[in-house]
């Protein structure tokens, strides 16, 4: 009986041991790898960071068939304990402690932990293996990380390509493979108006619309073309908000760069005028008559145009005139003073022009830069040369075209004195003369970089003029002079009234 009693006690202990093992396994739940299944990725931003998001469990009632499986598993465990009573002998205290730990672990499991988009799960930490940061090139251990651009990053290593500060926002801008804060990208790449200095707004269709000068590249909002923003009458640049242009008092404004070399009165312009006459003489195209030259205001030039019966070929904005009729013209006698962004104490004088030949005088607007004033003089002197040499009744495209060629060639002689592309064309007329070389530039000591750039703009204006008489006429005249030379082209014009083809 004693043996039988011990056997029952041992059987009871072992049954309880087997049951506790099964209960521990049941309370432990499924394996971590099964609980943390594939997690969807959340995309943040534009072509952006990929965050790892765990699947949150839903509150559902356990299926009924789970209870049947539990009863079946309990029966198997009891049968197994009875079969192996002689092989198992476990201490009661250890079994109780193991059961307590299992219950405690089960109670500590919280299926509704706060969601952290940057925190990887334990399964991910084990499965991702060795990861290298795309920024510092060091291993990414446990903790927060970013997945973007096909690489992994420490949060502090994923930085803006402009300001170099970490990108912590959920949205950012990607240019190629370079990430930017959205504001940094806007500062770098969103066009700003060069006039109001603000970001150019979008139009009704959401597109960024702006105007840009074809030569200077100055960008500005379309509204500045209609809000009376001053525009330089010489270089065509619009006045920025942080700069003041000089008002010439006749509706024209002048930027500071153009004002630096502006010619303001008739006496100041005489040396330039005589240097251009010398340029013509060096081309074997000497003007035999002394033609007066006057600098005038805009109103005086317009009045002289109205009184001129000949020469209907004028640009929308006329800046020079070759007179053939006797008139009284008011010229600028003394250079005005500059004060408070306007001209002061301008002294003018009326002057009666008497006709002594086919040309009465040459008039040019005052206040223009030296190179622009010179190109206008070269153009108007060619009108005078044609009239003095007996060229009559020429079409507008022919006369204005060949005059523009002379203006173009003089400008080139000033800004490209030794490397002119048109050197051969401009000297071909003087091939029979001993003076076959291009005259030196009229400004001693050369010109500044700013003035040279301004001269290149005036060349660009002549070459790209869209008008029929001045634009098409110049291009046809240039092609003829470039192909046949200036002398042969002029002879052909005298005989046929047109350019050689």
From Swiss-Prot:
Q: Which residues cross the membrane?
A: none
Consequences of knocking out this gene:
Mutant plants produce grains with reduced size.
Record has Transmembrane as a keyword: no
Q: What Gene Ontology molecular-function terms does this entry list? A: metal ion binding; ubiquitin binding
What are the protein's UniProt keywords? Answer: LIM domain, Metal-binding, Repeat, Zinc
* Listed InterPro entries: DA1-like, DA1-like_dom, Znf_LIM
Basic and acidic residues bias: start-end ranges:
53-67
What positions does the domain UIM occupy?
A: 65-84, 94-113
- The yes or no answer to whether the keyword Transcription is present is no
Question: Which Gene3D superfamilies does the record associate with it?
Answer: Cysteine Rich Protein
Record SMART domains: LIM (SM00132)
- Signal sequence bounds: none
| Chain ranges of the LIM zinc-binding domain | 131-191
Q: Where is this region: Disordered?
A: 33-67, 429-448
Q: PROSITE patterns per the record?
A: LIM_DOMAIN_1, LIM_DOMAIN_2, ZINC_PROTEASE
Please quote what the entry notes about the protein's domains. The UIM domains bind molecules modified by monoubiquitin or ubiquitin chains and promote coupled monoubiquitination.
The UniProt subunit note reads as follows: Interacts (via N-terminus) with GW6A (via C-terminus).
Q: What does this protein do?
A: Ubiquitin receptor that functions as a positive regulator of grain size and weight. Functions in the same genetic pathway as GW6A to regulate grain size. Modulates grain size in a similar manner to GW6A, by altering cell proliferation in spikelet hulls. Interacts with and enhances the ubiquitination of GW6A. This stabilizes GW6A, delays protein degradation by the 26S proteasome and enhances GW6A histone acetyltransferase activity.
Any extra remark in the record?
Plants overexpressing HDR3 produces enlarged grains.
Protein name (Swiss-Prot/TrEMBL): LIM domain-containing protein HDR3
